[in-house]
């Protein structure tokens, strides 16, 4: 690409009344704009070719700090858009050469975009994570060796056995709660998907993540969904609810489809 400015596409939506909320800013602080083509609207923003042309973008995507900033700006636009319409979020760094490229992207992906928007209309995404937390027994097992030596060998072994049984009980309770909760939430939701558990070493969140799921829920049933999550409780188990979000996990367009459509728009 040779132009200094490219068009970053945040999302696709249907035409809607009103405007984007004031103060909505995307990549580089650039306010997003709406580009209508037929029965679809692309939400775009100008970005520098020096960062988003194909070669520099590959390098930028290896920079975790830059990537995190871009993801936050991307999500800010989607969140603002969600207050006025139902958006179909596109993947991070979907870039076209110019407005003509954006129009080609809408044309080439038209049927997939329409199907996905029909599926998402009136629905939001909720995230649910379940963690098995180290209980007091496990902490007891990890007492300093000096303290362990103060007790007899029999007492020490008894304490370790009790800690192990307690820890196994935590895992069993967490597993049972995950199965029960996922079944109940799936009945309340239009769709659900289970993601790979988070690594505590990377997330910094205490406990072991045993369920990392997302659910597509009608707005009208969101209160019922939240109450189901709030009612889930077991000793040694923590349940975390996030949302409501724009339905990233249920965009309904495979990564390869988005990539092909993106390439057509360049």
Swiss-Prot record:
GO biological process: gas vesicle organization
Major subcellular site: other
UniProt KW keywords: Gas vesicle
Induction / repression: Gas vesicle production is induced by growth conditions that promote production of secondary metabolites tiancimycin A and B.
Keyword Lipid biosynthesis: no
Pfam families: GvpL_GvpF
Subcellular location: Gas vesicle
Record bears the keyword Protein biosynthesis: no
GO cellular component: gas vesicle
InterPro entries: GvpL/GvpF (IPR009430)
Function: Might be involved in nucleating gas vesicle formation. A minor component of the gas vesicle. Gas vesicles are hollow, gas filled proteinaceous nanostructures found in some microorganisms. It is not clear what function gas vesicles perform in soil bacteria.
Family statement: Belongs to the gas vesicle GvpF/GvpL family.
PANTHER family given in the database record: PROTEIN GVPL 2
Other observations noted: This strain probably produces some gas vesicles from the probable gvpO-gvpA-gvpF-gvpG-gvpJ-gvpL-gvpS-gvpK operon; it can be induced to produce more under certain growth conditions.
Protein name, as recorded: Gas vesicle protein L
Native source organism of the sequence: Streptomyces sp. (strain CB03234)
Lineage: Bacteria, Bacillati, Actinomycetota, Actinomycetes, Kitasatosporales
């Amino acid at each position: 690409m040779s132009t200094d400015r490219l068009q970053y596409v945040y999302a696709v939506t249907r035409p809607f009344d009103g405007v984007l909320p004031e103060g909505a800013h995307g990549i580089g602080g650039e306010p997003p704009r709406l580009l209508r083509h037929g029965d679809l609207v692309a939400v775009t923003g100008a970005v520098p070719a020096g960062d988003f042309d194909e070669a520099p973008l590959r390098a930028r995507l290896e920079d975790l700090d830059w990537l995190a900033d871009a993801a936050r700006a991307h999500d800010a636009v989607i969140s603002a858009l969600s207050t006025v319409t139902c958006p179909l979020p596109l993947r991070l760094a979907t870039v076209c050469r110019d407005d003509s490229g954006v129009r080609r992207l809408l044309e080439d992906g038209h049927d997939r975009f329409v199907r996905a928007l029909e599926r998402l209309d009136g629905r939001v995404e909720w995230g649910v994570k379940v963690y098995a937390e180290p209980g007091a027994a496990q902490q007891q097992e990890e007492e300093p060796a000096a303290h362990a030596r103060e007790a007899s060998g029999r007492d020490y072994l008894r304490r370790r056995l009790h800690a192990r049984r307690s820890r196994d009980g935590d895992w069993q309770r967490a597993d049972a709660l995950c199965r029960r909760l996922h079944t109940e939430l799936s009945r309340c939701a239009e769709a659900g998907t289970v993601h790979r558990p988070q690594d505590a070493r990377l997330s910094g969140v205490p406990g072991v993540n045993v369920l990392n799921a997302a659910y597509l829920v009608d707005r009208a049933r969101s209160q019922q969904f939240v109450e189901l999550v709030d009612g889930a409780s077991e000793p040694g188990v923590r349940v975390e609810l996030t949302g409501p979000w724009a339905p990233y996990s249920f965009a309904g367009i495979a990564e390869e489809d988005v990539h092909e459509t993106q390439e057509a728009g360049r």
